[in-house]
């Protein structure tokens, strides 16, 4: 499934970036985002949301760049879910800086109508931490709870693997593109998640991991979760 407005929302994110509340403001202002995108500079200034720098970025980026990303998703069999789609999780619309676009591999569970718990923690987890992350992932999934985590080493991977062992639904929110081979040793886990849940990211499929993207994706993990279980964490952890 590729959203009918994917071209426009992808183009907007390429220009305005990610983790910005301007996405929320545009969503609230326009019933159909095509009106904004096709309105040109006059409309972009009239809406009152964008700075001169934002407008210059919109003018500099061609919509064909969004077309390339859409074609790539079609080739890879990924879904593109946008903020104005009916299947977009309502819980994500209610946060600061909602992601305009979700790239999805697998089937996004019904997060809005099912209990979901985030399980997070350090990449440098102790044996005790990884054991408990796995145990909680397994036990919660056995109770029909959707688990949500970030696919990183340590706590994240242990919780995902626990859910998979219980044949439960788990959602992995990545801080890179879903086609990027992040942590090759866990590719088997990511492949399994696409069969029993979903890999999701706000970044285009081949986007490499950059440090600031991981704290930013934490807002998505938190929003998708009715509660967050922190297994083990350092004082300065994101």
Model-based region annotation:
Residues 1-5, 74, 80-238:
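Glycine-biased, small-residue-rich flexible motifs in mid-sequence functional cores and linkers
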Residues 1-86:
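Short, small/acidic-rich helices and loops at N termini and domain boundaries
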């Amino acid at each position: 499934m590729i959203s009918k407005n994917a071209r426009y929302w992808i183009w907007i994110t390429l220009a305005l970036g990610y983790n910005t509340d301007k996405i929320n403001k545009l969503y609230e202002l326009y019933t159909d985002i095509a009106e904004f995108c096709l309105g040109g500079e006059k409309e972009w200034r009239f809406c009152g949301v964008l700075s001169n720098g934002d407008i210059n970025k919109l003018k500099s980026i061609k919509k064909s760049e969004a077309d390339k990303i859409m074609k790539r998703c079609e080739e890879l069999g990924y879904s593109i879910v946008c903020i104005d789609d009916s299947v977009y999780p309502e819980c994500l619309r209610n946060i600061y800086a909602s992601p305009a676009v979700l790239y999805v591999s697998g089937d996004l569970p019904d997060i809005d109508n099912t209990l979901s718990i985030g399980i997070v923690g350090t990449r440098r987890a102790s044996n005790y931490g990884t054991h408990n992350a796995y145990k909680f992932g397994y036990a919660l999934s056995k109770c029909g709870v959707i688990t949500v985590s970030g696919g990183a080493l340590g706590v994240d991977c242990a919780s995902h693997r626990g859910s998979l062992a219980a044949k439960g639904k788990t959602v992995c929110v990545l801080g890179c593109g879903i086609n990027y081979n992040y942590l090759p040793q866990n590719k088997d886990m990511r492949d399994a998640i696409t069969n029993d849940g979903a890999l999701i990211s706000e970044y285009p499929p081949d986007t490499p991991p950059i440090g600031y993207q991981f704290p930013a994706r934490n807002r998505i993990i938190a929003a998708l979760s009715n509660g967050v279980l922190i297994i083990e964490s350092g004082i300065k952890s994101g």
